Curated annotation (Swiss-Prot):
PANTHER family found in the cross-reference section: ACROSIN, ACROSIN-RELATED
Name of the protein: Acrosin
Miscellaneous comment in the UniProt entry for this protein: On the 2D-gel the determined pI of this protein is: 6.4.
Source organism of the structure: Meleagris gallopavo (Wild turkey)
Subunit and partners: Heavy chain (catalytic) and a light chain linked by two disulfide bonds.
EC number(s) recorded for this UniProt protein: 3.4.21.10
Keywords: Disulfide bond, Glycoprotein, Hydrolase, Protease, Serine protease, Signal, Zymogen
Functional summary from the UniProt entry: Serine protease of trypsin-like cleavage specificity. Synthesized in a zymogen form, proacrosin and stored in the acrosome.
pH dependence per the UniProt record: Optimum pH is 8.0-8.5.
Length: 346
């Protein structure tokens, strides 16, 4: 039995519960970055390539330099989750492209995939003044291929206790300086920083955000400031490690803040858990007749039978560092062997 337990743990690590993944067999895993090193986002450090393999750069030629406009997270091979306020102008959508698997936006390697946007779905009740319902879905013109540098993010369903997650990070290519007036340099290399989830009531108190936050918001950063998301990080991920396994949940979408890195003004995020059903509804409604049904990509807390998703590519791009099918076969073989040995002793 001691031999079976580690195998069961590996199987569980290849398909987390409490949420959904969009194919490629798994979500929330970082094949290249098993050991997270030192923790620019404001006050952060450069991320190693592959550290956050679901983050994407949404680019528009109207923006200087690399054209980076906003971030986003790949949640299925053909859908990206981002912030609605990034797409206030229709021509931004038509002219934009999505870069997946990149780290340095000035040097896109062979592992990077680039897609056009087929459609953008902004929340129907998004308000760009109050920033309520600041969430959007982007359908890519064709699916991407999972690899060591391209993975899917896990969106938590309502059963996950997000407030109990303590190991959380933000990442993006946004401005890196603390902003009082004009923003400073935009990052070319992906930046990352560790943050704390802060109590929403505290963030909404009179000396902080003074009641302007909504129940679907998350608040993350540090009371003293210094580390924060900034302009250009919008739409990107707020990610927390699962409390019992080495995979990450996409718990928030970067929405807004007052300044960058200021005391008592932490970053404000849209809770993905709050909009879980909205996300499912939109992607189901947009499903193409030739595509897999959305239920193919679902995994909830009631899921008990192991992964049923089929990788979109051969094993060279299998997204799970421990291929689930092989593990199940090995696990079954060991179990049969032990049963045979026990039977011979009887």
């Amino acid at each position: 039995m001691a031999l079976l337990l580690p195998l069961a743990v590996l199987l569980a690590a290849c398909r987390p519960g409490h949420g959904f993944s969009g194919g490629c067999d798994t979500c929330g895993l970082r094949p290249v970055a098993y050991h997270y090193g030192g923790m620019r986002v404001v006050g952060g450090t450069e991320a190693l390539h592959g550290s956050w393999p679901w983050i994407v750069s949404i680019q528009n030629p109207r923006f200087a330099g690399t054209g980076h406009m906003c971030g986003g997270s790949l949640i299925t091979p053909q859908w990206v989750l981002s912030a609605a306020h990034c797409f206030g102008r229709p021509n931004y959508i038509l002219q934009s492209r999505v870069v997946i698997g990149a780290n340095d936006l000035t040097q896109l390697g062979q592992e990077v995939e680039v897609r056009s946007i087929r459609r953008a779905i902004l929340h129907e009740y998004f308000n760009n003044k109050t920033m309520i319902n600041d969430i959007a879905l982007l359908e890519l013109d064709r699916p991407v291929h999972c690899s060591y540098y391209i993975q899917l993010a896990c969106v938590p369903d309502p059963s996950l206790r997000v407030s109990e997650l303590t190991d959380c990070y933000v990442s993006g290519w946004g401005h890196m300086g603390m902003r009082s007036a004009a923003p400073t340099q935009t990052a070319e290399v992906l930046q990352e920083a560790k943050v704390h989830l802060l109590d929403l009531n505290l963030c909404n108190s009179s000396h902080w955000y003074d009641g302007v936050l909504h129940s679907h918001n998350l608040c993350a950063g540090y009371p003293q400031g210094g580390i924060d998301t900034c302009q250009g990080d919008s739409g990107g991920p707020l990610m927390c490690r699962d409390s019992s396994a080495d995979y990450f949940w996409l718990v928030g979408v970067t929405s807004w803040g007052r300044g960058c890195g200021r005391a008592f003004r932490p970053g404000i995020y849209t809770s993905t858990q709050h909009f879980y059903n909205w996300i499912l509804l939109q992607v189901r409604a947009a499903a193409h007749p030739t595509s897999r049904t959305w239920s193919h990509y679902m995994s909830t807390s009631s899921y008990h039978h192991g992964p049923n998703a089929v990788p979109t590519q051969p094993s060279v791009s299998d997204s799970c560092p421990f291929p689930a099918q092989k593990l199940r076969e090995f696990f079954t073989g060991v179990q049969n062997l032990l049963q045979s040995l026990w039977g011979s002793k009887a």
